[in-house]
């Protein structure tokens, strides 16, 4: 039962009833109400945390309460984990009272669909896994060198050309290829469907358009946006391409605005991820347009950063201003620290914690996502011969659970900028969704 007139609580109730039906075969009625036997979902309770909840099981009923619909949903997840898989049998739950709340407001998980593409149903299943674990942010990596995966109507070549590669390297850049054309992308309507599906599970989808590096697929579609003018091809190997967006070309800025302008119409999230990682500067160093931009902006290199590193900050700041004007915020990988942070940016620290610590000291919000603890494309055991292929590394589940995201080197005031954590799944070596589930 759920509070009458509350659509989100009704969806919570329908979600739980559907789960119980699938798991046990038992059909529960879903109706508005505040009293009675059965499972009662209620707003209120004693939790002062917006995502907190109370779960109380007695011989009369089960009551899940919280100050928000999201809090109640997390209580539902705890109940889900208590229900045994018993098709056709009565369900017995022990009498219990649980009060709980999440430590961090941002609890994220990332899926790369550029290196390998996964259809809508698989993405929804990934979201279902996040919901079970009280994850409230889904970081969706939808563009990279190996494929552009989201429809941009003003730039149709991004998917007509940029979503397809001729073949894919076998293994770790062995020089051998599978000879099979590969592609796929999401229409805007499909992306909106996924956004709505996630929202019903109290998960916000954060899209990532990686820039100015990791743009080989986009350059294949629009070669005039690169420093050399191409020709380019959608990458069929893994790694980092030297070919990036030309920072001296005004058409690059228009391209960024066009893409982000459509992205914010699809994704209502506060954050838009702009990447900013692994952007080689070799093309910019010899590009007349980029060097002219450096001169026009009066950029000078120094002992800390090259002029080209400061030029990347110009691109990220341009994207931030565009998004801020539309009421959105940018988030980027910790490389956006190089050359100076854009004024309102949030840093996602993946190369260890140092980037996050530096950003917090500069009073910027931080999401901790260190590869040494939270990269799920690493091997889970040392028996690599009997594990699915991975990028390398070794990350057993014990190490994941041992992670403490609040650096002791920060003052209490600086620690306030650590907003949460995120696990990342890159898919160079993960071609199937069954392997996604395994990792």
Give, region by region, the residue ranges found by the protein language model:
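Flexible, acidic glycine-rich loops studded with aromatic residues
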Residues: 329-345, 350-439
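Gly/Pro-rich turn-and-neighbor structural signature
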Residues: 253-257, 261, 265-276, 280-348, ...
């Amino acid at each position: 039962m759920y509070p009458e007139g509350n659509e989100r609580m009704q969806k919570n109730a329908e979600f739980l009833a559907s789960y119980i039906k699938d798991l046990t075969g038992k059909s529960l009625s879903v109706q508005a109400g505040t009293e009675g036997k059965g499972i009662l979902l209620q707003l209120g309770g004693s939790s002062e945390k917006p995502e907190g909840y109370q779960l109380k099981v007695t011989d009369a009923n089960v009551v899940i309460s919280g100050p928000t619909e999201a809090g109640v949903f997390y209580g539902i997840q705890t109940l889900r984990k208590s229900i045994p898989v018993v098709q056709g049998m009565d369900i017995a739950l022990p009498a219990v009272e649980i009060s709980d709340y999440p430590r961090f407001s941002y609890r994220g998980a990332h899926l790369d669909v550029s290196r390998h593409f996964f259809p809508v149903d698989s993405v929804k299943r990934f979201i279902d896994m996040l919901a079970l674990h009280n994850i409230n942010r889904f970081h969706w990596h939808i563009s990279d060198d190996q494929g552009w995966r989201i429809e941009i109507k003003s730039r149709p070549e991004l998917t007509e050309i940029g979503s397809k590669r001729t073949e894919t390297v076998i293994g770790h850049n062995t020089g051998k290829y599978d000879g099979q054309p590969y592609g796929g992308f999401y229409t805007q309507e499909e992306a909106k469907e996924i956004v709505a599906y996630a929202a019903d599970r109290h998960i916000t989808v954060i899209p990532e358009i990686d820039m100015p590096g990791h743009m080989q697929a986009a350059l294949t579609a629009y070669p005039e946006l690169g420093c050399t003018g191409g020709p380019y091809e959608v990458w069929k190997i893994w790694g980092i391409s030297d070919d990036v967006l030309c920072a001296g070309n005004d058409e690059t800025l228009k391209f960024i605005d066009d893409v982000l302008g459509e992205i914010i119409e699809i994704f209502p999230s506060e954050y838009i991820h702009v990447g900013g990682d692994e952007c080689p500067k070799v093309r910019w160093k010899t590009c007349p347009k980029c060097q002219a931009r450096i001169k026009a902006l009066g950029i000078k290199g120094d002992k800390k950063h090259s002029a080209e590193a400061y030029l990347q900050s110009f691109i990220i700041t341009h994207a931030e201003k565009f998004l801020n004007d539309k009421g959105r915020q940018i988030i980027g990988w910790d490389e956006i620290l190089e050359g100076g942070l854009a004024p309102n940016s949030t840093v996602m620290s993946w190369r260890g914690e140092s980037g996050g610590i530096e950003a917090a000291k500069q009073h910027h919000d931080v999401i901790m996502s260190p590869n040494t603890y939270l990269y799920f494309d690493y091997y889970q055991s040392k028996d690599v011969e009997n594990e699915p292929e991975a990028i390398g590394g070794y990350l057993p589940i014990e190490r994941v659970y041992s992670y403490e995201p609040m650096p002791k080197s920060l003052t209490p005031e600086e620690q306030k900028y650590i907003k949460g954590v995120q696990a990342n799944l890159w898919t160079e070596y993960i071609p199937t969704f069954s392997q996604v589930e395994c990792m």
